[in-house]
Design a protein with these regions (language model features):
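Histidine-acidic metal/acid-base catalytic patches
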Residues: 1-4, 9-14, 51-55, 72-76, ...
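Aromatic-lined carbohydrate-binding surfaces of glycoside hydrolases
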Residues: 66-73, 105-114
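Glycine-rich, positively charged N-terminal anion/phosphate-binding segment
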Residues: 13-17, 23, 41-60
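Short, well-ordered beta-to-alpha junction loops that form the rim of enzyme active sites
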Residues: 104-108, 208-210, 317-319
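Aromatic- and acidic-residue-enriched segments that line the glycan-binding/catalytic groove
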Residues: 109-164, 223
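A short glycine/small-residue-enriched secondary-structure motif
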Residues: 22, 58-74
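Glycine-rich, proline-tolerant flexible connector loops at the mouths of alpha/beta enzymes
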Residues: 32-49, 216
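Conserved beta-strand positions in the central sheet of alpha/beta enzyme cores
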Residues: 28-30, 63, 103, 205, ...
Length: 360
């Protein structure tokens, strides 16, 4: 596997490439053209500029997160083919620039949902958190206003102000979309893009819905083992794979994370590994990556990835705000650097333990 860090670009990220380069074991970044609207084509020139900037810092672009899917594609509206054609052109340009991993999601309206961006933990750090009670007590239109004050002056993915300003229109677009229709639209999209993925060896890695259940009555389908296996079977192509995000699938305590990993052997193209601390099944907060700080056994998650021969990019996910850092919530430098080092340490211990066991 290759340890990476998510980076939003020098215009939007408080973390610099030079800082990322100094994290032991991190050799690449997962990045995006953050100022490109969903549905627009990524030009080769912009991709080349992005790669050159990353390479100048001694790193490389290990993958893209995300090439966002336009709502016309998710809803199956009359103009979806225009936006799919643009998506295919973007994939072709990425392939020509030797980029072979694209993380994306198929979540309606909201990318991910948290009700707090700065919940204080016992150690004084602040973290992202979710309570179903808070969601049930608020209108979708008021959701952005309720959390925007804790964004630290940054623009968070999936919560862009210009998108949130259209939230009523977005909900209207999805009023006739249920789980089955969303699956149909995902299948149509995947069938259209697989030829260009085959041509350029591009692995599409769908990100799970977060949290892994319906929010505000919206359909959510990438939520559990059964549904993800269905997605892979309906478009049975090795380039149709997943981003295994422990912190997203893990929002539903019924999901057995190590078992899911083993069932997805060969189709996990990218991994996000983080920990959550549950106060109840629908009240959780993000924790340090260390197993004892949260609910998940991080050793077992990494062991499962090792056992299936996972060799793709991996990254620590949302970090705490610690040591006075002011950054995009979840995406500061310090705690993610600690997380990367911890995950690398687990991997090295597992790898050497297996090797020494084999020698005996």
């Amino acid at each position: 596997m290759e340890m990476t860090l998510r980076w939003y670009g020098s215009k939007f990220d408080t973390v610099t490439l030079e800082q990322i380069r100094q994290i032991p074991g991190v050799t690449g970044v997962i990045t995006t053209l953050y100022d490109t609207a969903p549905g627009d084509v990524w030009s080769r020139e912009r991709i080349q500029e992005m790669k050159a900037e990353v390479a100048a810092a001694g790193l490389h672009v290990a993958g893209i997160e995300s090439v966002n899917v336009h709502d016309a594609i998710k809803t199956g509206s009359a103009d979806r083919d225009k936006y799919i054609d643009n998506y295919i052109e973007t994939l072709e340009n990425l392939g020509k620039e030797d980029i072979h991993l694209v993380c994306y999601n198929f979540m309606p309206v909201f990318d991910w949902t948290r009700t707090e961006l700065a919940r204080q933990r016992p150690d004084g750090s602040t973290v992202l958190a979710y309570t179903q009670e808070a969601v049930d007590a608020i209108n979708p239109e008021d959701m952005f206003a309720s959390i925007s004050g804790d964004m630290n002056g940054t623009v968070m993915p999936g919560w862009e102000p210009e998108r949130m300003a259209k939230i009523k229109d977005l909900f209207a677009m999805y009023k006739d979309i249920d789980d089955e229709k969303l699956f149909e639209n995902l299948k149509y999209f995947l069938e259209r893009i697989m030829p260009v993925c085959d041509k350029y060896d591009i692995n599409m890695a769908i990100h799970p819905d977060d949290p892994a259940w319906s929010v505000f009555g919206l359909p959510r389908i990438i939520i559990n083992k059964k549904n993800i296996l269905r997605m892979m079977e309906m478009v049975d192509n090795p380039h149709n794979g997943v981003t295994f995000c422990s912190g997203s699938y893990g929002t539903n305590l019924e999901n057995d994370l190590p078992d899911m990993i083993r069932s997805l052997k060969g189709r996990i193209h990218f991994a996000h590994v983080r920990n959550l601390k549950f106060n109840s099944p629908t009240d959780f907060e993000e924790a340090a990556h260390l197993s004892s700080d949260g609910t998940f056994d991080m050793y077992e998650i990494m062991k499962a990835l090792y056992d299936i021969g996972f060799d793709g990019p991996i990254r620590p996910d949302h970090g705490r705000m610690i040591w006075g850092e002011v950054a995009m919530p979840g995406y500061g430098l310090y705690d993610r650097a600690l997380g990367a080092t911890y995950l690398n340490g687990l991997w090295e211990a597992i790898e050497k333990g297996e090797t020494r066991h084999a020698v005996k």
